Design a protein with these regions (language model features):
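Beta-strand acidic-aromatic groove motif in beta-rich domains, primarily in extracellular
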Residues: 19, 28-40
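Extracellular carbohydrate recognition and processing domains
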Residues: 44-81, 92
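Extracellular beta-strand-rich recognition modules
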Residues: 17-23, 68-71, 80-89, 102
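Extracellular carbohydrate recognition
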Residues: 29-31, 64-65, 76, 88-108
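Single-stranded nucleic acid-binding surfaces, predominantly the OB-fold ssDNA-binding core
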Residues: 25, 37, 46-50, 100
Length: 109
């Protein structure tokens, strides 16, 4: 995601982010999903990475479901781009890692 349109605000160092998603899986299977956020400068150098999840089977009481996970942080002042990645991990059988309503919001402080 291109952030160069708000580079002045980011440069002032008063922009934070909120990353949210409903994450989960199937039954007692330990298939799981995580969401990563990575901020890069204009040369493609990684400035900051963070993320939310995963939600393991034990976190779901070995039932099928999705649960809200949230993360907040500061956007590095020289950020030009941000990438959001969903990683699904398979424990066995089919991959039943779930994600819904993934959201990244940038906020002024």
């Amino acid at each position: 995601i291109d952030l160069t349109g708000i580079e002045a605000e980011i440069g002032w160092g008063n922009i934070s982010y909120s990353l949210t998603a409903f994450l989960g899986g199937y039954s007692s299977q330990n298939d799981r999903m995580e969401v990563l956020v990575e901020f890069f400068d204009s040369s493609g150098n990684l400035l900051l990475s963070g993320g939310i999840g995963p939600v393991h089977a034990a976190d779901r009481n070995n039932t099928t479901g999705i649960f809200l996970r949230e993360g907040i942080g500061e956007v590095p002042p020289s950020s030009a781009y941000v990438r959001v990645t969903l990683n699904a991990y398979l424990s066995y059988g089919y991959n039943d890692a779930y994600a819904d309503n993934v959201s990244l919001i940038l906020l002024t402080q």
